[in-house]
Amino acid sequence: MAFGHRERPAPAGVLTAAETAETAAAIGRVQRTDGGIPWFRGHHLDPWDHVEAAMALDAAGEHDRAEAAYDWLARHQNDDGSWYAAYADDGPATPADRAAETNFCAYPAVGVYHHWLATGDEAFRRRMTPVVTAAVEFVLRFQRPGGELGWRRDPDGTAAPGALLTGSASAHHALRCALALAELAGTPQPDWELAAGRLGHAVRAHPERFLDKSRYSMDWYYPVLAGTVRGAAAHARLAARWDDFVVPGLGVRCVHPNPWVTGGESAELALALWAAGLPRRATEILRCLARLRTDDGMYWTGYVYADDAIWPEERTTWTAGAVLLAAAALTGDHATRTVFSGATLPTGLPPDCC
């Protein structure tokens, strides 16, 4: 699979306007009255996937619902700037869910900046900037000397060992969005700029600093999706394991070599391909997900093609959200393109050493 050139724009018709509205309405039906967006009715909410779904609502024009989701985050932020790993209706889903994952806590910065780009709502930006600031300060307590982020604080307050490449790439994206918000607020954050430079360098140049999760497709494409790897390096990264993870006509494996393609990973790869200047390939991947679309506009999580079986039998808001965001980028949504192209996001300062 050649990746040596930028492609012409993607063909139209990724999702129709009616299909987009139907999917957004389906996410809205799962959203609770307090603004929280769980995976599906009766299941837990986690902060990262909650933000993914909120961004999808904004991309579909459901700005009031998206704002309610961000207000939920503001109300549930812990005093130290963190959020718990998972929530039931009235608090952490289990005692173990009192852990805090660094990429979960960083990601609201991406959503808040996306919502401001989508709406221009200055009151919202002013209200949410302190929330983002507290979250970033929490996350950066876990940055290691090599630039990578420790992935989790356990419920007893100790830092879990190890760093995750996908999580660090996601947090690098979030840190750049947080810097953009700081610029809008007129509050320079030089420490964040240094942290962003070190974190991006670790993701690009030091895979040995991360736990080996190379079986998972997210570790393959996420540095491109997050904007940490761009240009020829992005094309080379995507080409290197394309045949391991992409199943022609079906989508993207979640885990290699399992015969299981998943909607979330497929849509995220499509978004990464668009960001890398490969919209036709992105469109081809996104169109594979038609088999996972349900009558109400939601998407099944995955398909085991060896058994011709939908599995698991769940329809998650974050899968639907990823599809809407990929479609929004392909069809020209300004906020989504700005956030995921990364072209105008602050880059941080390069580290003094490697």
Which residue stretches match the model-derived regions?
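Residues within HEAT/ARM-like alpha-solenoid scaffolds
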Residues: 103, 123, 127, 166-169, ...
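Extended glycan-interaction surfaces of carbohydrate-active proteins
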Residues: 2-44, 68-105, 134-162, 196-264, ...
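A generic, well-ordered mixed alpha/beta core segment in the N-terminal half of proteins
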Residues: 88, 103-138
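Alpha-helical positions within canonical tetratricopeptide repeat
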Residues: 65, 124-127, 131, 191, ...
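Well-ordered alpha-helical scaffold segments within catalytic/enzyme domains
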Residues: 2-13, 51-63, 107-124, 169-187, ...
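Loop-centered beta-sheet repeat module
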Residues: 160-204
